[in-house]
C-alpha cells in the first residue's frame, strides 16, 4: 500500500470530491427522490464549495478532527491550485478543497468507519440547517 500521507493535497481532494459525492448521491436517492434535476439541486446543499467550507469550519470549531486529520485538511487547503470555483471566493474554495482532501485521505487509508462518521455528521448538519 502507498503512503498516502505523502500524497499531494490536490490529489487527495480529487479522490475525496468523488467519494463524498457518491455518499451524498446514495443518501439522496435513499430518500426516494428520483428526478435528476431535483437530486442535483438537493445535492448542492451538501457538495458545493460553500457547503463544504461551512461544514469544515463547524468540524474545526467543534474540535471533531484528530491531529492527523487536521494535517490532511491543511494539506488540501494550502495546496496551490490554478482553478477556482465559479460561485465561491478563494478562501471558501481552499477550505472546501481541504474538506475534500480529508475525505480522500480517509478513503485511501481505508478508514471507512471514520469517513462514514464524518459524512453522516455532515448530512445531519445540512439537514438541521435546511430545517431552519
From Swiss-Prot:
Localization per Swiss-Prot or TrEMBL: Cytoplasm
Upper lineage: Bacteria, Bacillati, Bacillota, Bacilli, Lactobacillales
Organism name: Enterococcus faecalis (strain ATCC 700802 / V583)
Protein name: Mini-ribonuclease 3
Pfam family, one: Ribonuclease_3
Protein's GO biological process: rRNA processing
Active site: 17
GO cellular component: cytoplasm
Family named by the database record: Belongs to the MrnC RNase family.
Job of this protein: Involved in correct processing of both the 5' and 3' ends of 23S rRNA precursor. Processes 30S rRNA precursor transcript even in absence of ribonuclease 3 (Rnc); Rnc processes 30S rRNA into smaller rRNA precursors.
EC numbers on record: 3.1.26.-
Keywords: Cytoplasm, Endonuclease, Hydrolase, Magnesium, Nuclease, Ribosome biogenesis, RNA-binding, rRNA processing, rRNA-binding
Amino acid at each position: 500500500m502507498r503512503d498516502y500521507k505523502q500524497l499531494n493535497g490536490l490529489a487527495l481532494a480529487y479522490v475525496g470530491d468523488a467519494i463524498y459525492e457518491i455518499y451524498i448521491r446514495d443518501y439522496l436517492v435513499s430518500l426516494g427522490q428520483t428526478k435528476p434535476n431535483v437530486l442535483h439541486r438537493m445535492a448542492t446543499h451538501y457538495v458545493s464549495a460553500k457547503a463544504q467550507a461551512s461544514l469544515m469550519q463547524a468540524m474545526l470549531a467543534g474540535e471533531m478532527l484528530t491531529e492527523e486529520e487536521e494535517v490532511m485538511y491543511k494539506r488540501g487547503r494550502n495546496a496551490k491550485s490554478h482553478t477556482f470555483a465559479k460561485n465561491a471566493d478563494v478562501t471558501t474554495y481552499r477550505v472546501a478543497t481541504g474538506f475534500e482532501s480529508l475525505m480522500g485521505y480517509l478513503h485511501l487509508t481505508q478508514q471507512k468507519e471514520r469517513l462514514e462518521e464524518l459524512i453522516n455528521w455532515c448530512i445531519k448538519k445540512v439537514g438541521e440547517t435546511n430545517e431552519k
